[in-house]
Amino acid sequence: MLDAMEDAHLSYGVYDFSRSLQRSRLRGFKEYAVDTGLFYAMSPATTDGLTRALETSVYLELRRRRQTGRHGEVSMLKLPSGKEVDFIWGDEAFGTAFDLVQVCLSMDDERTKAREISALEEAMSLFPGARATIVTLDEYGTEATPHGDIRIAPAWRWTLEKTA
């Protein structure tokens, strides 16, 4: 069923970033609906809709920006510690990453902020030189870490940025 939805461009699957095709399929998977109305129609009422809508819009923008490359460049990343980075863009065949993106509705809660930053920090230690960004609803700034700076950008600004 999911393959048919992808073939019809109704939704897209995101797999774990791995050099092994088998491992990437077994370790993690997220599905993103192209039409957020479809997401709301098919998800349980308990789902946090705004958070999921923001994550979906970030994924669709990453996919739009990367449409010139190979299919599958935008992945998710399960870290050895069990933490997860929402999106990683890179070359799976060579095990290199260029962008690490976390999506967070708000970082007002210190535990949420620490969770998002620690996941990116761990990923930055595995992929030196990768740009790290946390996309939020309306917060901005920079967080300095031992592995480099993490940029915090509101979704509207991040979406409008010119990319190389």
Residue ranges and their predicted role:
Residues 67-69, 121-129:
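Arginine/glycine-rich "motif VI" loop of SF2 helicases in the C-terminal RecA-like domain
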Residues 90, 97-109:
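Active-site ExK catalytic segment of metal-dependent nucleases
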Residues 22-23, 124, 142-144:
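Short secondary-structure boundary/capping segments
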Residues 137-164:
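Domain-level recognition of nuclease-like catalytic cores that cleave nucleotide substrates
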Residues 131-136:
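Short, hydrophobic beta-strand segments that form beta-sheet elements in well-ordered domains
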Residues 106-125:
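Mg2+/Mn2+-dependent nuclease catalytic core
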Residues 1-97:
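Accessory nucleic acid-recognition modules appended to NTPase machines
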Residues 85, 109-112, 141-145:
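Short active-site-adjacent structural elements
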